[in-house]
Amino acid sequence: VFTSGALQEKVHYQYGADEQFVMSEDQNFVILLLDTVDSRTITELLDEHPEYSEVFRDFTYFENTVGAYSCTERSVPYILSGDWYENDEPFDDYGKRVYQESPLFQTLQERGYNMELCDSELYMDTELMHMFSNIHVVDFELSSYTKFAKPLLKLIGFRYAPFELKKMCTFKKAAFAELLQVENTPEETSCSETDHVFKSQLDLQGITVEDSSKKFKFIHLNGAHVPYIYDKDMNIINELDGTYEQSAQATMVGAMDYVEHLRNSEAYDNTVLIVMSDHGYNGSLGQSGEATWMRQCALLLIKGRNEHHDTMQI
């Protein structure tokens, strides 16, 4: 077999989390992105949950924010770069370019920020990984090929099984991740986009402060995205019993937990914190009406450094 040299060996990356909850005593800039959280839903929940306004009292809530794209794959690169994808180049080329040309990343680097990225779904290569202190090339091994077969068969069955059996073929991406053993890694823990895992790690470790360079952290969590595996208090439930509204409340519980940990640390006043989503929610197939199918209502809450208010600003 002859090749032109265009084929490249698959590279595995670890998005390390050892420093995820370690802040700088100088300055910090954190973007906490909660997938699929619709601002219309949060606005409705504000009346039912006055604790939202209390916990986010130092934030400004931009309830009329309009998102750029309706899906994560397009939205997140735009959020990080401000560069539209015009469909005039391969998407991987665009994904690489937005890192290299991002005014946000360029400014952060010029100002001496150490950058951490916790979003394994974005484009990455060995050249770009050096921009981020927590991304490393590692080896992965399966802990059990037998256990791997079950989610793999469900994945295959979702396409090839008869329609009535497809409902039995749902699976979670985490089912694969749980079977991976990371080798040759410089960090003991990896970033998790699963909300309850992120929250449990936060509650266990807390937020600490160190004498170090300024820090930028981009943290992308599953948020209110399907499957709906949480009740309103972030307890795990059968996804068939879950709803979007419950998932939205659960992800707000996690976001408030992060804010409170930060508030109780010495890093609160020197941290810019943006709590946002990549896009809104478009309803289920059983719903109808024009408003149901609009996904542009993205969540946006912003707290500046040394910013304090008596109640959340809207």
Where are these regions (language model features)?
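Catalytic domains that recognize anionic headgroups
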Residues: 1-314
